[in-house]
From Swiss-Prot:
The keyword Membrane applies. A 1,2-diacyl-sn-glycero-3-phospho-(1'-sn-glycerol) binds at R139. NCBIfam families: lgt. GO terms for molecular function: phosphatidylglycerol-prolipoprotein diacylglyceryl transferase activity. The lineage of its organism: Bacteria, Pseudomonadati, Pseudomonadota, Gammaproteobacteria, Pseudomonadales. InterPro entries: Lgt (IPR001640). This is Phosphatidylglycerol--prolipoprotein diacylglyceryl transferase. Catalyzes the transfer of the diacylglyceryl group from phosphatidylglycerol to the sulfhydryl group of the N-terminal cysteine of a prolipoprotein, the first step in the formation of mature lipoproteins. One of its GO terms (biological process) is lipoprotein biosynthetic process. One of its GO terms (cellular component) is plasma membrane. Keywords: Cell inner membrane, Cell membrane, Membrane, Transferase, Transmembrane, Transmembrane helix. It is a multi-pass membrane protein.
Amino acid sequence: MLPYPQIDPVAVAIGPLQIHWYGLMYLVGIGGAWLLASRRLNKFDPTWTKEKLSDLIFWLAMGVIVGGRLGYVLFYDLSAYIANPLLIFEVWKGGMAFHGGFVGVMIAAWWFGKRNGKSFFQLMDFVAPLVPIGLGAGRIGNFINAELWGKPTDVPWAMVFPPFSDPAQLARHPSQLYQFALEGVALFIILNLYARKPRPTMAVSGMFALFYGIFRFVVEFVRVPDAQLGYLAWGWVTMGQILSLPMIIAGLFLIWLAYKRDPAASKAAA
């Protein structure tokens, strides 16, 4: 068993002002996305300025934050927010959902592309390889917060999370680190290697949806579901799996459609 590193969730405290590691992870994700995007900008569109890129990243970040919060409200704890709608604004207490953030990013990309002469999938193909930076950083934030841990296990790398998080004090899968490794590191490598060569429009977006969906679906088997939801079917299906399955199907369809529309790219890939 590995010891859980005791890290104060509050990174900096200045009087009543507290800056949490989880919030800083959002800044890491946004900043990392901007740096990588700026390196790829000339290949994407030589006419785009760094200012336009900054505008894009800003609106995508808004999509992540607003969509992530609304997604959590709708998918994971709707009854609590109906009973007390003001809870929606208490973001410092946690409650963000990737799938909601993903929808927010898609809406922001569609809106920004329409205003700047880019199609939805042109922008999504450009953005997709940037997303794992934020995903990985977010999972590290979850780990520091000692939240979203996994099921009890006797694997050698199991961890016992702090009593405030897990009163049962059981050795558990550090599922946040699994998601960091898969959704952050592995997905980053896959997408950025794949996007190095010219690909037909929609293909990179399809690869993102496919592999994120697979990685999330698999990790859900060892991650404890949200207490207010539990398992939704057959004693093992979680909300995360239900929301990830359409991503897998959509990813496969987008990849197939992308190469069907561009036979030359299909032959080159073969």
